[in-house]
């Protein structure tokens, strides 16, 4: 999966996310809804307008969960087990949506980290978020 250097890049970049979880999460969700409007079907009860309290709250939950994954990179299955159960059995979210949100989150990182979002950081986050998406989709099999 990730080598030592990639893990260090992820952890270092994550330090820039801390304190901005709600903003980054809301921005990623707003991007996902704009670029992939079919994802809105999973949020029929949400106010999907820019800067809505519901999007901000859920965005913070998403990015907080990613922070847990960053802290437990070597054991993602255990760290994300409850979240995987929730999305597979209760919410029944199509697993392709994890990849869509991952892509949008990477765009948010690139915008906010600017020059610090190097190609190496991009590759590391691409691999990391693909692993997170795969773990979240494990219960669908």
Swiss-Prot record:
Red blood cells. One of its GO terms (biological process) is hydrogen peroxide catabolic process. Keywords: Heme, Iron, Metal-binding, Oxygen transport, Transport. SUPFAM superfamilies: Globin-like. InterPro entries: Globin, Globin-like_sf, Globin/Proto, Hemoglobin_a-typ, Hemoglobin_oxygen_transport. The keyword Oxidoreductase does not apply. Residues 1-141 form the Globin domain. The keyword Iron applies. Heme b binds at residues 58, 87. Belongs to the globin family. PANTHER family: HEMOGLOBIN FAMILY MEMBER, HEMOGLOBIN SUBUNIT ZETA. Heterotetramer of two alpha-D chains and two beta chains. Involved in oxygen transport from the lung to the various peripheral tissues. This is Hemoglobin subunit alpha-D. It comes from Chrysemys picta bellii (Western painted turtle). The gene is HBAD.
